């Protein structure tokens, strides 16, 4: 009888140990991201084969701001193990609210810059601008469309660029001048680029658009091999996107493996075509059209001293008042 009891106890302990091991060894990793996150089937399969983990379907939670705010609201019971897509304008919110286990890791970047329609300017005999500061000039009246900084991350990034470049007491006059010079404000990037921009969908009325330094890589004329647009790579806003392990994640080890994979050359090399961003690893070669027509900006505004978190809403409200001529 004693041997039987001992055997049962041993079996119970062994079973509990196995159950504990199973509980401590998750077989999947969940990712929360912004809406633009893309990972190819081949890359997904490569990660899963190397790690033994399955990537669960991505929880796409909106733009960088919406993503960050939703993760703050669910930080005690996170919706994922790893986050991708918090950018440098919302990194402070993530850190302040303690949603990240460890540090945010830069994965990619994009430069918010103005683009112009080369054909339009050549046809009209107008010299294209070399800086957004010039857009207040009368010869550019009624030619520019931007995204609303209260509804668009692209627009908000550029608002920050004007504040960083012109100062907290100087940016207002530039926007007032742009209002008086007939600037068009679109709700988001897709509306501005594909509807309002003359070279986006071909039917717009504005030959200057707030977009990205990478955009000319996607307007190459197959017949000539040349791009029909150009980026004004002067005083752009560099938007950096991060990944991080979410605090209270069910599989933090798996999350770290996925972040390491995002830094590997295969994932980095896929970023331009997949998400229209530059790899943070500068040793990774860019696609041919990117290297030729869409180099990253060498001139971007230093916004490191701006307190995005404390003043974001005030700046947005002040911008709204300016554009409504209040």
Q: What do these predicted regions represent?
A:
Residues 1-29, 326:
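Short, low-complexity disordered leader/linker segments with a strong preference
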Residues 101-107, 133, 207, 220-237, ...:
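Short beta-strand->loop
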Residues 115-120, 163, 239-254, 270-274:
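A bilobed periplasmic-binding-protein/Venus flytrap-type ligand-binding module shared by bacterial periplasmic
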Residues 269-326:
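C-terminal capping/gating helix-and-loop segments adjacent to ligand/active sites or protein-protein/ligand interfaces
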Residues 78-83, 99-118, 132-134, 142-149:
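A structural signal for short loop-to-beta-strand junctions that line the ligand-binding cleft
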Residues 139-150, 262-285:
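Periplasmic-binding protein-like
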Residues 161-234:
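Ligand-binding pocket segment of bilobal, Venus flytrap-like solute-binding proteins
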